[in-house]
């Protein structure tokens, strides 16, 4: 049963789109909560720029960023399987204050907030290579 649940989580991570502002998906003033599971590129793109874009539009956001430099989808899957405490977890609160926790598991980060959006990032050299995505399955 645990393996089945992990398989479902991995599939959901891989299929979750990362579109926050398209087509008016933010119809009210609630806080949007975004979790990125990625590598060093998610630091700038998610932690800094996304928070600033939301702020400029008057959208309150909480952003979580789980990252390992150069991490591939395959490694993310292994970390999910093993509940590995392999990530640095940076969190940007509503007011923009940042905190960092080392040796974090994906399981703990998922439980930290009721995330609205979750993105999983492939390592840059492997991005767009379909065969590399196929190998990441559970």
Task: Pin down the residues of each PLM region.
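Residues that line or immediately flank small-molecule/substrate-binding pockets and catalytic motifs
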Residues: 8, 38, 122
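Bacterial N-terminal signal peptides
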Residues: 8-19
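Serine-esterase "nucleophile elbow" of acetyl-processing enzymes
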Residues: 23-76, 108
């Amino acid at each position: 049963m645990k393996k089945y649940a992990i398989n479902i989580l991995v599939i959901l991570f891989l299929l979750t789109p990362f579109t926050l502002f398209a087509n008016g998906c933010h119809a009210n003033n609630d806080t949007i909560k975004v979790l990125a599971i990625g590598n060093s590129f998610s630091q700038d793109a998610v932690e800094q720029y996304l928070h600033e874009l939301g702020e400029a539009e008057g959208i309150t956001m909480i952003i979580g960023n789980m990252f390992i430099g150069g991490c591939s989808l395959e490694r993310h899957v292994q970390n999910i399987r093993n509940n590995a405490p392999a990530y640095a977890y940076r969190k940007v609160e509503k007011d923009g204050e940042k905190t960092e926790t080392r040796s974090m598991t994906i399981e703990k980060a998922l439980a930290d907030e009721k995330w609205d959006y979750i993105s999983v990032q492939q390592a840059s050299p492997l991005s767009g290579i379909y065969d590399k995505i196929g190998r990441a399955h559970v």
